[in-house]
């Protein structure tokens, strides 16, 4: 099984965090969003990874290289211009000769990928969409499935008057390589707006798997802050601990110096090289020396 990590996003709604880094390289506590995704893939035995890159591609390539340091094998597919979600994966078609998983490099999740893949194979699906219940579906594609799990209806980013479900498309898919033959290479197309409506029209087997666990699209400053807080509050099942828990929702990793009179209010993450003096808190993720105010 191979995975395609879509990592070409610019992340304009995350500025200023993304002025000098691509969206997948934004740090969530102790590592980048994409590093968390790589960890999740490795946890589920998915070691062959194709990363689609476009905006500040060198930043991602330099950070992850061939993947050896992360225990995986990474190849890159470069887009000269943005091609959309489907177009970027189509651009990597030469690497995809069997069933593969698609996942965003800028989402935070702990979904059971093995269960999703098993479901896809059990249903003999052409495409399986990973779905999730959310309280506000307006920013996502809304999906309805029948009792068998077959996708019957969806609406991309509906208004409240168009909302017919709280089950949304997370952008995590298991696909058969044949679906990429529907569109030519170097053509801009989107999975939700172009490919999936076509599969539905053609009657191709397309199923939805409603996942449990944690998922959020780190697409705005608000969601970035929420994801960071959720990691600090242990709401996300990570593959490894973010650091040593020293009490009061305070985590440290590496060489950290805390002055005897320092006052800390969690949740806080203190990384290597941090020296704390005075007052620090809350929702802090620090690296290097800091003077509290």
What do the PLM-derived regions correspond to, one by one?
Residues 25, 143-145, 196, 208:
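A structural signal for short hydrophobic beta-strand segments in well-ordered beta-sheet cores
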Residues 13, 59-62, 91, 112, ...:
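Phosphate- and divalent-cation-binding pockets in alpha/beta enzyme and binding domains
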Residues 200-283:
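Extended, small-residue-rich solenoid/repeat segments and analogous flexible loops
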Residues 6, 28, 52, 77-79, ...:
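Generic beta-sheet signal
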Residues 46, 100-101, 108, 114-121, ...:
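Catalytic-core segments of class I nucleotidyltransferases/pyrophosphorylases
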Residues 1-61, 293:
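N-terminal glycine-rich phosphate-binding loop and ensuing alpha1 helix
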Residues 61-62, 67-147:
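Conserved beta-loop-beta/alpha segment of the NTase-like Rossmann-fold superfamily
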Residues 36, 87-91, 195:
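Well-ordered alpha-helical segments embedded in enzymatic catalytic cores
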């Amino acid at each position: 099984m191979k995975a395609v990590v879509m990592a070409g996003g610019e992340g304009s709604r995350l500025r200023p965090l993304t002025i000098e880094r691509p969206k997948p390289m934004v740090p969530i506590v102790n590592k980048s969003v994409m590093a968390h995704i790589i960890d999740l893939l490795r946890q589920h035995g998915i070691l062959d990874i194709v990363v689609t890159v476009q905006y500040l591609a060198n930043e991602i390539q330099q950070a992850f290289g061939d993947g050896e340091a992360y225990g995986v094998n990474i190849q890159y597919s470069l887009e000269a211009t943005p091609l959309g979600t489907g177009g970027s994966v189509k651009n990597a078609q030469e690497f995809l000769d069997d069933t593969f998983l698609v996942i965003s490099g800028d989402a935070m999740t702990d979904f059971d990928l093995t269960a999703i893949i098993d479901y896809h194979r059990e249903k003999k699906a052409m495409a399986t969409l990973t779905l999730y219940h959310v309280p506000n579906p307006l920013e996502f594609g809304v999906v309805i499935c029948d009792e068998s799990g077959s996708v019957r209806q969806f609406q991309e980013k509906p208004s409240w008057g168009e909302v017919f479900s709280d089950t949304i498309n997370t952008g995590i898919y298991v696909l058969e390589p044949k679906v990429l033959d529907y569109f030519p290479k170097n053509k801009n197309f989107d999975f939700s707006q172009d490919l999936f409506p076509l599969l539905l029209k053609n009657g191709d087997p397309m199923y939805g798997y409603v996942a449990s666990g944690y998922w959020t699209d780190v697409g705005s400053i608000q969601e970035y802050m929420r994801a960071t807080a959720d990691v600090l509050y242990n709401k996300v099942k990570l593959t490894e601990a973010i650091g040593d828990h020293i009490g009061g929702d305070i985590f440290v990793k590496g060489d950290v110096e805390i002055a005897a009179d320092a006052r800390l209010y969690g949740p806080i993450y203190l990384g290597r090289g941090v020296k704390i003096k005075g007052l620090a808190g809350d929702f802090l993720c620090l690296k290097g020396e800091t003077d509290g105010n």
